[in-house]
Amino acid sequence: MPIKRMWGGRFEEAGDQLVNQFNASISFDQEMAQEDIEGSLAHVKMLKETQILSAEDADKIIAGLKKLRERLTSEGLPFSIDNEDIHMNIEALLTEEIGPVAGKLHTGRSRNDQVATDLHLYVKKRLPIIINELKKLQAELVDKAAENVETIMPGYTHMQHAQPISYGHYLMAYFQMFQRDVERFEFNQQHTDLSPLGAAALAGTTFPIDRQLSAKYLGFAGPYHNSLDAVSDRDFALEFLSNASILMMHLSRLCEELIYWCSYEFGYLELADSYSTGSSIMPQKKNPDMAELIRGKVGRVYGDLFSLLTTMKGLPLAYNKDMQEDKEGLFDAVKTILPSIKIMTGMIATLQVKKEAMEHATHHDFSNATELADYLATKGIPFREAHEIVGELVLKGLKTGTNLVDIPLDEYKKISPKIEEDVYTCLQPKVAVERRNSYGGTGFDQVRQQIKDAKKILEGK
């Protein structure tokens, strides 16, 4: 049932219906119902411990909150727009459950620190879930890389064939991207792991509360050191959205290549049927819709970030109603990135790699040109001169339809008498890849080492 507005004493007129609807946030902040109850439980336990509330009153409130928590889990709670937000809805339901003593719950607390606490708890809970899902994706990338250490494919710059690489090496590049995402979310935990509870409206409270105790009850590392900062800070949410945006950018880049490489023109990969869809008119189609959807959802997460950045940019201290707009984008980002990570994990796990098609693409594309330039440099020809020579040979090959491996040895000897039969060996794509064993390179030994190191990271060593 609706309760009398908690702030209504100063007002003579009832609110306009449209204004009340515009002001209400229960349609979306009910997402934090669990967190709101948890925050209230911690607060009332602290009030009991500090003897601000009697044990009898506190125990009634605690029992009532626990009943609401059980109902929320089992059947849900009946929220009303008349009660404006999740905090007032929970208090209204608590009042129905235990009577007027519920009004004592708000002693030494404001909705300003209450909502900030709820939001901290919401993000704090979800960060380890996201990190865990990212690690599952990384594990699939490592497994797929281990299967494809010696799978040769074209490496690209400017979407043009550049040099042959190991497909395993390519996959490990994404492992590293997602590792940075993991580290960013882990760092995000530090700024999220602070309790605003007890900061009250902005200046603290005259009640002898114990903020360290309520922070401990909620599992926070400690309370904010400044009450103004506690109620006005949304940096932790901005960090989360920034991290989510970078993560989605990484997923989008991977999706872009999956989409290309599953096409008829490339034919390097094939997605499992379970991660593809068909066409209502074209019977032959197998569309990479999941990859396209992930790529498309990047924009909404970017929008969530820029929405909150724009909301916060001009706000004076401390709390402003603008900050009600901090939640929907945050909730949306969480609900977007988690399924995106899970679906990408499944796509990688079930991905069919067409090794022959990949390697075939490296045999007539001149991606071995750098190998020839390096080879000539080892024979004493300055690299810049070698680069010019090979460029001319490539141009000639393009005009005649021949490749560098088709040039007779006597033609090579005209360039330098030091060139031997082994020039043809170095021009083989697999040899070219295998020889690039500088640290972090695409050489097979280096890729195996990257995989070994990655497994240690995933094992926490």
Swiss-Prot record:
Subcellular localization(s) per the UniProt record: Cytoplasm
Chief location: cytoplasm
Sequence similarity: Belongs to the lyase 1 family. Argininosuccinate lyase subfamily.
Name listed for the protein in its UniProt record: Argininosuccinate lyase
Signal peptide bounds: none
Keywords, alphabetical: Amino-acid biosynthesis, Arginine biosynthesis, Cytoplasm, Lyase
Catalytic activity: 2-(N(omega)-L-arginino)succinate = fumarate + L-arginine
Encoding gene, per UniProt annotation: argH
Gene Ontology terms: biological process: arginine biosynthetic process via ornithine; L-arginine biosynthetic process
Record organism: Limosilactobacillus reuteri (strain DSM 20016)
Cellular component terms per the entry's GO annotation: cytosol
